[in-house]
């Protein structure tokens, strides 16, 4: 089955992306160790939750790439929106965590960024620079899952002991 219209592809991909993100959150406790555990959010830090804006859209676009020109072309076009969505999730997530302890704000941000990422992935032109940035961000997610730096985006909001040295 090929879906020709961009809106139809979006209508297929958006719930799939949200479902994949929900599965990632559900698997968080049972698969928290090892390489696969590095793909899942390990805690409620903005960096870890930004994995929801990175891995589910990539997986969704890879799974549905036949509908829009094959895996290579689809992921090349999607590189910039996915990188920007994940970085915006980390940045605005850090701001949201500092302003409110509500995870609903972060989840709403994730839903909006997932929709924007998938919509832009249909229209963006591919570039090797964005593909390299996509790979670098993926490597950073793996690296910082095991040894995160002591910076606000990487710290769990409820961890007062970790946040104390950062306080002015």
Q: Model-predicted segments: where are they?
A:
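Alpha-helical transmembrane segments and their helix-start/interface "positive-inside/aromatic belt" motifs
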Residues: 2-15, 126-135
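Alpha-helical transmembrane segments
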Residues: 9-22, 84-85
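Membrane-interfacial loop-to-transmembrane alpha-helix junctions, especially the N-terminal start
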Residues: 10-13, 72-82
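Hydrophobic cores of alpha-helical transmembrane segments in multi-pass inner/ER membrane proteins
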Residues: 17, 51-64, 110-122
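Alpha-helical transmembrane segments of multi-pass membrane proteins
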Residues: 17-33, 142-148
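Short aromatic-rich membrane-water interface segments that cap or initiate transmembrane helices
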Residues: 38-52, 161-168
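Membrane-interface helix caps and helix-loop-helix hairpins in membrane proteins
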Residues: 95-104
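C-terminal, well-folded lobe of enzymatic/effector domains
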Residues: 104-168
């Amino acid at each position: 089955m090929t879906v020709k219209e961009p809106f139809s592809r979006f209508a297929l991909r958006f719930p799939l992306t949200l479902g994949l993100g929900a599965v990632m959150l559900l698997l968080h406790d049972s698969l928290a160790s090892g390489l696969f555990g590095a793909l899942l959010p390990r805690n409620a830090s903005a960096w870890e939750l930004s994995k929801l804006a990175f891995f589910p859209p990539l997986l969704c676009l890879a799974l549905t790439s036949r509908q829009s020109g094959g895996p290579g072309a689809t992921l090349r076009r999607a590189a910039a929106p996915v990188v920007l969505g994940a970085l915006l999730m980390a940045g605005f997530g850090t701001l949201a965590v500092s302003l409110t302890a509500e995870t609903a704000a972060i989840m709403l941000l994730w839903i909006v960024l997932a929709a924007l990422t998938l919509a832009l992935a249909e229209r963006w032109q591919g570039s090797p620079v964005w593909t390299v940035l996509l790979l670098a961000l993926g490597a950073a997610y793996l690296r910082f899952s095991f040894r995160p730096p002591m910076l606000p985006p990487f710290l769990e909001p409820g961890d007062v002991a970790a946040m104390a040295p950062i306080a002015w």
